[in-house]
């Protein structure tokens, strides 16, 4: 598993401390086809129901994401992110967030015993 630059295709080890390529391109994660994602870090269930409502004769389906553990749909991304970095052995992360992403990531990081610093703009 390694990161590669979308722009110049340069490869970086998964343990790289860079947040982007030297050329300015963004990283993508390359995983072996047979490598499974391990999801063992959780702080609660990830199932939310669909509610059906009709407005002016049109049926709408509403997803009750507010029932996720931190009350935000951002739990889905944080769950995936933290499980992946926990799986590869990353022990410390930092992010910037004005709210839900920071709270969700910090909650899942705490469950995985990963040191998490959230910078609030």
Protein language model features and the residues they cover:
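PLP-dependent amino-acid enzyme catalytic core
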Residues: 1-121
């Amino acid at each position: 598993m390694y990161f590669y630059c979308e722009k110049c295709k340069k490869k970086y080890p998964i343990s790289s401390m860079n947040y982007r390529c030297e050329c300015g391109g963004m990283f993508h994660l390359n995983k072996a086809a047979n490598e499974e994602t391990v999801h063992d870090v959780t702080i609660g269930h990830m199932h939310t129901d669909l509610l059906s409502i009709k407005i002016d004769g049109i049926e709408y389906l509403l997803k009750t994401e507010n029932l996720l553990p931190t009350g935000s749909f951002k739990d889905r991304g944080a769950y995936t992110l933290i499980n992946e970095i926990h799986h590869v052995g990353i022990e410390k992360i930092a992010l910037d967030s004005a709210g839900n992403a920071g709270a969700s990531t910090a909650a899942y990081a705490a469950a995985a015993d990963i040191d998490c610093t959230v910078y609030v703009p």
